[in-house]
C-alpha cells in the first residue's frame, strides 16, 4: 500500500516547507493548469461554460503571467527534486492562446536548470469533435514532457530493460519503449475537475520512471488521480505520494476516492516537512 497524502494547500507553500526541511522527492508527475479559459466569448453563459474546467480556479492567466508562473514553478522543483530526478509534465495548448504552452516550455529551457529530455505523445481514447473552427483539427493527443536537469541528461533514471549485452565491448542494448501511449481521457467524469488525466496514463509513466520506494509529488493533484496511480503501482510498494490541491472539495473527493479504492479510509496525516501550526 502506498503512502498517499493529500494537502489542501498551495503547492508553492508546500514546496517552501519541503526545501526548508531539506525534504526531497524522486519524481514530479503532474498535469498543470493550461491557461485555456476564454475571456473573448460574447455572452456570460459562454464565459461560464468555457471557464468551468475546475471548481475554483479560473485558469485565465495571460501568456506573460503564465510563462513567469511556469519559471517559478520549475525553479522551485529544482529545490526539492533529488539528484537524477525527473519531472513528467502533461500539458497541451489552448484553443485561444496556443503560444502559452510553447513559450512556457521555451522558458523552462532558457530560464531554469532544466531541459526537455524526451517528449511522449499521449493519444486519448476519445475527443470532442471540433465542429466550430474552420481551421483547427480535432485534438486527440497531448504531450508529456520528460524533463531533467541539464547537468543530469546522461544520468537521469529510466526503467528500460536491458535485452542484450555485447560480449566484446560490454555495450548494453535496451528494449524498445516507444514515446507513444494510448490511455483513457480520465477515470470517469467529475464536475469538480474536467481536465483530462487518467491513472492508466500515470501508471504507464510510473513503470518507466519510478520504483517501489520512490517519493512522487503532484503539485496539482486535482481529484487524486496521481495518488490512485501510486496506489495501483504495486500492492507491496512503499511508494510515497504527496499531492497539493487548492480546492477543498477536490481534496475531500480525492480522500473518498482513495477510500473506495482501498475499501478503508486513510486520513491525511502530518508529513515530514510540516510545521507545528497545521
Q: Locations of the language-model features?
A:
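S-adenosyl-L-methionine
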Residues: 1-17, 255-278
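Core catalytic lobe of class I
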Residues: 2-253
Amino acid at each position: 500500500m502506498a503512502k498517499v497524502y493529500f494537502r489542501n494547500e498551495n503547492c508553492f507553500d508546500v514546496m517552501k516547507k519541503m526545501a526548508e526541511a531539506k525534504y526531497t522527492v524522486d519524481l514530479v508527475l503532474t498535469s498543470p493548469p493550461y491557461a485555456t479559459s476564454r475571456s473573448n466569448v460574447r455572452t456570460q453563459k459562454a464565459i461560464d461554460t468555457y471557464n468551468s474546467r475546475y471548481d475554483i480556479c479560473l485558469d485565465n492567466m495571460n501568456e506573460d503571467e503564465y510563462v513567469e508562473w511556469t519559471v517559478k514553478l520549475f525553479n522551485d522543483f529544482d529545490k526539492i527534486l533529488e539528484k537524477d530526478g525527473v519531472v513528467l509534465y502533461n500539458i497541451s495548448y489552448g484553443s485561444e492562446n496556443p503560444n502559452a504552452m510553447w513559450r512556457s516550455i521555451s522558458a523552462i529551457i532558457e530560464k531554469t536548470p532544466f531541459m526537455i529530455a524526451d517528449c511522449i505523445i499521449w493519444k486519448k481514447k476519445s475527443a470532442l469533435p471540433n465542429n466550430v473552427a474552420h481551421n483547427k483539427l480535432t485534438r486527440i493527443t497531448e504531450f508529456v514532457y520528460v524533463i531533467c536537469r541539464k547537468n543530469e541528461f546522461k544520468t537521469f533514471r529510466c526503467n528500460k530493460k536491458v535485452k542484450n549485452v555485447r560480449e566484446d565491448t560490454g555495450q548494453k542494448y535496451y528494449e524498445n519503449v516507444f514515446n507513444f501511449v494510448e490511455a483513457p481521457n480520465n477515470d470517469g467524469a467529475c464536475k469538480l475537475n474536467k481536465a483530462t488525466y487518467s491513472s492508466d496514463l500515470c501508471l504507464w509513466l510510473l513503470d518507466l520512471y519510478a520504483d517501489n520506494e520512490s517519493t512522487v509529488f503532484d503539485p496539482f493533484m486535482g481529484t487524486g488521480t496521481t495518488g490512485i496511480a501510486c496506489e495501483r503501482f504495486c500492492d507491496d510498494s512503499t511508494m510515497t505520494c504527496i499531492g497539493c490541491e487548492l480546492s477543498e472539495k477536490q481534496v475531500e473527493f480525492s480522500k473518498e476516492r482513495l477510500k473506495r479504492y482501498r475499501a478503508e479510509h486513510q486520513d491525511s496525516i502530518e508529513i515530514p516537512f510540516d510545521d507545528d501550526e497545521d
